[in-house]
């Protein structure tokens, strides 16, 4: 069958859950037996989010092929239990860069370059490329209808509907139905205005998703259907819920597949959601609970750690455990070590820069001495080596050259002649451009037999995990570390990929980011092992 396109837009305001809605629709179609892909379009002019502050953008999600993408790509992978790639996310910056490069090469034969047709044609080309090989492509447009940045994309959507027809392209619009608490009344006017704005552009949505705090009655649904020119069964309620993973089940119950099937001329859709339903029930009402101390520095925007938070939920669902996160600000921890006393384990996530480092080092020292489970990820692993070097090996000046370029004991250093995932050699220095110059994407890791990592990965000796870092553990110190009980449990082409303490119940550090490959139906092995170990050592 020809690829069918489902365009998802948002109105009234941002952060309505377009990513979760897109993921949920794609999941229901996938579980109905179709092959489904998703594309996220980001209208900002940055080439990618790789150099954006986590506090500005949230998490940067890394795909298996090394793309630094929007965090919604993480939702897509976690819901559909499949890998996505560079082609599944593009920005206005990439569109303009491509068009300008083509103009410089003379590919437009001297014509004046304009938004229409050149920019819009490039957008349509990338949308179609993302859908190749799939039955469905769900396209999520970031931002809000009416934003000037989104206009070329809406024009591209309008043209695709005109070119391909209503049996191959549908539009789903998500809006907010605010609750006026003083009157206890839901208001539909913002939604009506949002749809009017979309129709002025030339797009009439076939399905309306109403995000709201409480359910809509039949009269409100009828009113929305009439004013927004959609069928009565095409007003779908997206009510606030206890878990994002319940959303596909809620949409299924609301009947969203009925108008989708009708407009795209599909047969009856019967998704198989039994296993999904079972896991959701374990998220909402688990038998056990644990508390993990999450020592970070981007705590004012917890979406900076989105994949890691979700990976703990996945591990919890698969162990029937509620994972409670105690957020601990590493910048205030040095003078407040009592914050660590009531947690069952500690998690030290990745990050960049010197701010908050001393607090993380104190947390690592506490876990090492008190024998409580610890998982250090990326920077967390590097700091575990620095803490061990300073407090066990007596190397008081041990540091990373990221924090002290002149350190006499560079336990963590920068590889200048770096071999990337395609086998190419990149020259890297402190002055190299920030964007795209890190170790990015999926790399192999050889695991040492008999280690905790070996057990976590089901006694596999070769795994693949994703990376996003610039600095590495210095192999010059490896023999000294191992002689004193810090085991190198994983490596890749001579690079140290994972470490663990010999005389400790569970003290593991990994240079890769296991959270990027965790899925609800397939939790990452090292995250799952960490949660299981935390449960085993839970404080009574």
Curated annotation (Swiss-Prot):
Enzyme nomenclature, EC number: 6.3.4.2
Gene3D superfamilies linked: 3.40.50.880, P-loop containing nucleotide triphosphate hydrolases
Pathway: Pyrimidine metabolism; CTP biosynthesis via de novo pathway; CTP from UDP: step 2/2
Binding site residues for L-glutamine: 351, 379-382, 402, 470
Pfam families: CTP_synth_N, GATase
Keywords tagged on the record: ATP-binding, Glutamine amidotransferase, Ligase, Magnesium, Metal-binding, Nucleotide-binding, Pyrimidine biosynthesis
GO cellular component: cytosol
One of the GO BP terms on file: pyrimidine nucleobase biosynthetic process
Activity control, per UniProt: Allosterically activated by GTP, when glutamine is the substrate; GTP has no effect on the reaction when ammonia is the substrate. The allosteric effector GTP functions by stabilizing the protein conformation that binds the tetrahedral intermediate(s) formed during glutamine hydrolysis. Inhibited by the product CTP, via allosteric rather than competitive inhibition.
Domain of life: Bacteria
Positions that bind UTP: 14, 187-192, 223
GO molecular function: ATP binding; CTP synthase activity; glutaminase activity; identical protein binding; metal ion binding
Sequence segments annotated as region (Amidoligase domain): 1-266
Residues binding Mg(2+), per UniProt: 72, 140
Family: Belongs to the CTP synthase family.
Subunit relationships: Homotetramer.
Miscellaneous comment: CTPSs have evolved a hybrid strategy for distinguishing between UTP and CTP. The overlapping regions of the product feedback inhibitory and substrate sites recognize a common feature in both compounds, the triphosphate moiety. To differentiate isosteric substrate and product pyrimidine rings, an additional pocket far from the expected kinase/ligase catalytic site, specifically recognizes the cytosine and ribose portions of the product inhibitor.
This protein's name: CTP synthase
Originating species: Helicobacter hepaticus (strain ATCC 51449 / 3B1)
């Amino acid at each position: 069958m020809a690829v069918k396109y489902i365009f998802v837009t948002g109105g009234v305001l941002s952060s309505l859950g377009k990513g979760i809605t897109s993921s949920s629709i794609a999941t229901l179609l996938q579980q109905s037996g179709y092959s489904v892909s998703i594309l996220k379009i980001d209208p900002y002019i940055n080439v990618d989010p790789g150099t954006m502050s986590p506090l500005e953008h949230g998490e940067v999600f890394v795909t298996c092929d090394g793309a630094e993408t929007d965090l919604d790509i993480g939702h897509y992978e976690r819901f559909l239990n499949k890998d996505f790639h560079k082609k599944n996310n593009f920005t206005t910056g990439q569109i303009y860069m491509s068009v300008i490069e083509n103009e410089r090469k003379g590919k437009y034969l001297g014509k004046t370059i304009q938004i229409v047709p050149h920019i819009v044609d490039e957008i349509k080309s990338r949308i179609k490329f993302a859908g190749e090989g799939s039955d469905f492509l769900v396209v999520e447009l970031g931002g809000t209808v009416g934003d000037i940045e989104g206009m070329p994309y809406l024009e591209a959507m309008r043209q695709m509907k005109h070119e391909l027809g209503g049996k191959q392209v549908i539009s789903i619009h998500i809006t907010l139905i605010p609750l006026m608490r003083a009157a206890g009344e839901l208001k539909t006017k913002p939604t009506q205005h949002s749809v009017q704005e979309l129709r002025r552009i030339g797009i009439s949505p076939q399905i309306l998703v109403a995000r709201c705090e409480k359910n809509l009655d039949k009269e409100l649904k009828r009113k929305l259907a009439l004013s927004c020119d959609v069928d009565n069964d095409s007003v779908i309620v997206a009510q606030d819920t206890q878990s994002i993973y319940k959303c596909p089940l809620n949409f299924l119950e609301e009947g969203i597949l009925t108008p989708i099937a009708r407009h795209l001329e599909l047969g009856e859709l019967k998704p198989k959601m039994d296993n999904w339903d079972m896991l959701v029930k374990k998220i909402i009402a688990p038998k056990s609970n644990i508390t993990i101390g999450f020592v970070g520095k981007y705590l004012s925007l917890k979406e900076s750690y989105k994949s890691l938070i979700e990976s703990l939920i996945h591990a919890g669902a698969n162990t029937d455990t509620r994972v409670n996160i105690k957020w601990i600000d590493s910048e205030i921890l040095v003078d407040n070590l009592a914050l660590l006393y009531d947690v069952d384990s500690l998690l030290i996530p990745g990050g960049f820069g010197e701010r908050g480092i001393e607090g993380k080092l104190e947390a690592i020292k506490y876990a090492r001495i008190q024998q409580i489970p610890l998982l250090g990820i990326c920077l967390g692993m590097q700091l575990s080596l620095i803490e061990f070097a300073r407090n066990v090996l007596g190397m008081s000046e041990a540091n990373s050259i990221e924090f002290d370029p002149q350190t006499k004991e560079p336990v963590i250093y920068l590889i200048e002649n770096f071999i990337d995932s395609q086998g190419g050699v990149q020259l890297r220095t402190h002055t190299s451009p920030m964007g795209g110059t890190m170790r990015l994407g999926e790399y192999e890791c050889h695991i040492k037999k008999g280690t905790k990592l070996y057990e976590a990965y089901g006694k596999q000796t070769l795994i693949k995990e994703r990376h996003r870092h610039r600095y590495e553990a210095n192999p010059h110190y490896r023999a000294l570390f191992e002689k004193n009980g810090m085991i190198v449990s994983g490596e890749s082409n001579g690079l140290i990929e994972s470490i663990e303490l010999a005389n400790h119940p569970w003290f593991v550090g990994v240079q890769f980011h296991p959270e990027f490959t965790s899925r609800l139906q397939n939790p990452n092995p090292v995250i799952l092992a960490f949660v299981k170990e935390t449960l085993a050592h839970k404080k009574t």
